Amino acid sequence: MNIPNSPLRRVVIIGGGFAGITLAKQLTRHNLQVVLIDKHNYHTFQPLLYQVATGGLEAGSIAYPLRKVIQGFPDFYFRLTTVKEIDTQNQKIISEIGDLHYDYLVIATGSKTNYFGNKEIERNAMSMKTIPQSLNIRSLILENFEQAVLSKDANERNALMNFVLVGAGPTGVELAGALAEMKRAILQ
């Protein structure tokens, strides 16, 4: 991984989401070597994924380079890789680009969509946790709206312009509002 040996204790943080970068920033006040690892070289500002999905923002507007988070701090490093295994016995991680020993390990890899055991929703729903997923949703929305404009059948138009949202948390509510706004402003 090309991380220099150091007399400092090494903290390895797996995950560059909110928890991972918040911890990395807080550790700047301590005398430690910090290695931030993520499978992407950017942090996704997830509260605005609905804006990407509805075309309000471009993906680059909610992606922040992880290297900038730790830039300028001595003994702070970022590595773009996927962790394949954690060897707690030997205090090391095994990744696609090599092994790395740690004194402290923090796993901050975020959350997964919980379907609460509903297999039907799990099979048919589109999650919105990442930028690529938001872009896929945007493509579907725009394709449906374009087909609706061309349709002469009112029932078909209605079906193409309506979506089922599962989840009424902040993201679901924001997405519902943005979809209603799109439908009203763009297609009327």
Task: Go through each PLM region and give its residues.
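FAD-binding core/adjacent interface of flavoenzyme oxidoreductases
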Residues: 1-9, 76-164, 182
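Beta1-alpha1 glycine-rich phosphate/pyrophosphate-binding loop at the start
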Residues: 2-76, 161-164, 170-188
